[in-house]
């Protein structure tokens, strides 16, 4: 197995796992004040009636990125097993899906970052982004690496010549 394909499979798997952890945890934003601390994520608790629009946008694009990541990983796995894939098709599909996942995450993370950054601050409360948020950005970088490495795997794949057909 080529090094680009192996590394693409590794980055795709790591990106997918880190995104699933980021999306499923409630430590995107944290706040500390005198005598209390709080944290929140993408999924509202039962006592919250309305959810801001930017949260819905972030949820939707993160779910899309998970789907793109699943497809990318699946095609990379299938490309490693010759009986399951058409020759040379797995890495190119994984390239498109990796970049689609990265683009979806860039939209989701940018919307969340801008909206949270522009919220009014209370001088007695220290608010900051937490580890789930940063894991979302790490997933974005991993999906970009997946796309690039899959493209490298596609470009270096040996294709039969015309005479072999």
From Swiss-Prot:
Topological type in the membrane: Multi-pass membrane protein
One GO CC term, this protein: cytolytic granule membrane
Major place of residence: membrane
One example of a Gene Ontology biological process annotation: natural killer cell degranulation
InterPro entries assigned to the protein according to its UniProt record, in alphabetical order: PMP-22/EMP/MP20-like (IPR050579), PMP22/EMP/MP20/Claudin (IPR004031)
Top-rank taxon, per record: Eukaryota
Compartment(s) where it occurs, according to its Swiss-Prot or TrEMBL record: Cell membrane; Cytolytic granule membrane
UniProt entry keywords in alphabetical sequence: Cell membrane, Cytolysis, Inflammatory response, Lysosome, Membrane, Transmembrane, Transmembrane helix
Family annotation (Pfam families): PMP22_Claudin (PF00822)
Transmembrane spans: 9-29, 61-81, 92-112, 133-153
Recorded family membership: Belongs to the PMP-22/EMP/MP20 family.
Stated role: Regulates cytotoxic granule exocytosis in effector lymphocytes, thus acting as a critical mediator of inflammation in a broad range of infectious and non-infectious diseases. Essential for cytotoxic degranulation of natural killer (NK) cells and CD8(+) T-cells and for the activation of CD4(+) T-cells following infection. Plays a critical role in CD8(+) T-cell and NK cell-mediated cytolysis of target cells and contributes to the cytolytic activity via the perforin/granzyme pathway by enhancing exocytosis of LAMP1-carrying lytic granules.
Name the UniProt record assigns to this protein: Protein NKG7
Lineage of the species this protein comes from: Eukaryota, Metazoa, Chordata, Craniata, Vertebrata
């Amino acid at each position: 197995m080529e090094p680009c394909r192996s590394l693409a499979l590794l980055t795709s798997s790591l990106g997918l796992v880190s995104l699933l952890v980021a999306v499923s945890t409630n430590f995107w934003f944290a706040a500390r004040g005198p005598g209390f601390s709080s944290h929140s994520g993408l999924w509202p608790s039962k006592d919250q009636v309305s959810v801001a629009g930017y949260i819905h946008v972030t949820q939707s694009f993160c779910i899309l990125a998970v789907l793109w990541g699943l497809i990318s990983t699946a095609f990379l796995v299938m490309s490693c097993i010759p009986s399951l894939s058409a020759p040379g098709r797995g890495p190119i599909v994984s390239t498109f899906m990796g970049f689609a996942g990265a683009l979806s995450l860039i939209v989701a993370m940018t919307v969340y970052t801008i909206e949270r950054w522009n919220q009014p601050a209370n001088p007695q409360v220290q608010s900051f982004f937490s580890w789930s948020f940063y894991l979302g950005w790490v997933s974005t970088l991993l999906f970009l690496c997946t796309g690039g490495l899959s493209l490298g795997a596609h470009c270096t794949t040996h294709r039969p010549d015309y005479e072999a057909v």
